[in-house]
């Protein structure tokens, strides 16, 4: 295999499972190499690991600073960078959903709306979703506590990631509709995927054997 493949890895909630996957696949000698280090660039054997914010991973991969990356489907859908999506890694499960105040039934049936004001940390996903419904949407970009927006009259609905739904319930919000399921994905730089086709396919195979996933229909040549 190519000596020197570089992985971009996500800080935060996906990090422990990502490290575990890399270890089980044989790309790390010990999990502690990543879990106990405060370095942002770490070499272990022939591999280099860049530890960064999930939202920066598509940038590192697209521009060739990393050959491969592991990142949530939410980031991929929001940014739509020029990268290959190779494999569903089947962890970090949640979903995009539209939610609204329980006591505002006029926005519960999205099919009857002609316009809506939506708050989200994912404005591009939100715009595309409502455009697909034929609903004019004013999208307000949020950076945190998106559940607050409909409670104070800033928005009619929100589009956000939902896991257990507990945060929605605690804020008297209900899920109106699911937009799409979200999991961690393996992505690749387009040039690296062609130049190191054999090496990257071998990596995909190792991950696939562990997670039982199906490789997307992507032509790496």
Swiss-Prot record:
Which Enzyme Commission numbers does its entry carry? 2.4.2.17
Per UniProt, the enzyme's principal EC class comes to transferase
Localization recorded for this chain is: Cytoplasm
Pathway it works in = Amino-acid biosynthesis; L-histidine biosynthesis; L-histidine from 5-phospho-alpha-D-ribose 1-diphosphate: step 1/9
Q: Which UniProt keywords apply?
A: Amino-acid biosynthesis, ATP-binding, Cytoplasm, Glycosyltransferase, Histidine biosynthesis, Nucleotide-binding, Transferase
Q: Which InterPro entries match?
A: ATP_PRibTrfase_cat, ATP_PRibTrfase_CS, ATP_PRibTrfase_HisG, ATP_PRibTrfase_HisG_short
Substrates-to-products reaction catalysed:
1-(5-phospho-beta-D-ribosyl)-ATP + diphosphate = 5-phospho-alpha-D-ribose 1-diphosphate + ATP
Matches recorded under Pfam families: HisG (PF01634)
Query: What top-level branch of life does the organism fall under?
Result: Bacteria
Return the GO cellular component terms, semicolon-separated.
cytoplasm
One GO molecular function term? Answer: ATP binding
GO BP annotations, alphabetical order: L-histidine biosynthetic process
Family indicated by similarity? Belongs to the ATP phosphoribosyltransferase family. Short subfamily.
**Assembly description:** Heteromultimer composed of HisG and HisZ subunits.
Per its database record, what is this protein's job? Catalyzes the condensation of ATP and 5-phosphoribose 1-diphosphate to form N'-(5'-phosphoribosyl)-ATP (PR-ATP). Has a crucial role in the pathway because the rate of histidine biosynthesis seems to be controlled primarily by regulation of HisG enzymatic activity.
Q: According to its record, what is known about the domains?
A: Lacks the C-terminal regulatory region which is replaced by HisZ.
Under what name is this protein listed? ATP phosphoribosyltransferase
Encoding gene, per UniProt annotation: hisG
């Amino acid at each position: 295999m190519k000596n020197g493949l570089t992985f971009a890895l996500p800080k935060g909630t996906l990090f422990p499972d990502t490290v575990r996957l890399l270890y089980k696949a044989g790309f790390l000698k010990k999990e502690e190499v990543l879990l106990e280090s405060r370095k942002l660039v770490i070499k272990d054997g022939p591999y280099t690991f860049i530890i960064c914010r999930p939202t920066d991973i598509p940038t590192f991969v697209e521009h060739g600073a990393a050959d491969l990356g592991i990142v949530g489907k939410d980031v991929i859908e929001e940014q739509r960078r020029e990268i290959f999506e190779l494999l569903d890694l089947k962890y970090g499960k949640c979903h995009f959903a539209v939610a609204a105040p329980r006591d505002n039934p006029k926005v519960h049936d999205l099919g009857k709306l002609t316009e809506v004001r939506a708050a989200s940390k994912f404005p591009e996903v939100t715009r595309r979703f409502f455009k697909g419904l034929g609903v004019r949407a004013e999208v307000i970009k949020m950076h945190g506590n998106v559940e607050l927006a409909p409670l104070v009259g800033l928005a009619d609905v929100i589009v956000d990631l939902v896991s257990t739904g507990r945060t929605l319930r605690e804020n008297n919000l209900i899920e109106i509709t699911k937009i799409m399921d979200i999991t961690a994905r393996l992505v690749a730089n387009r040039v690296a995927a062609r130049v190191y086709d054999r090496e990257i396919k071998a990596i995909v195979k190792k991950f696939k054997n562990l997670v039982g996933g199906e490789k997307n229909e992507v032509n790496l040549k």
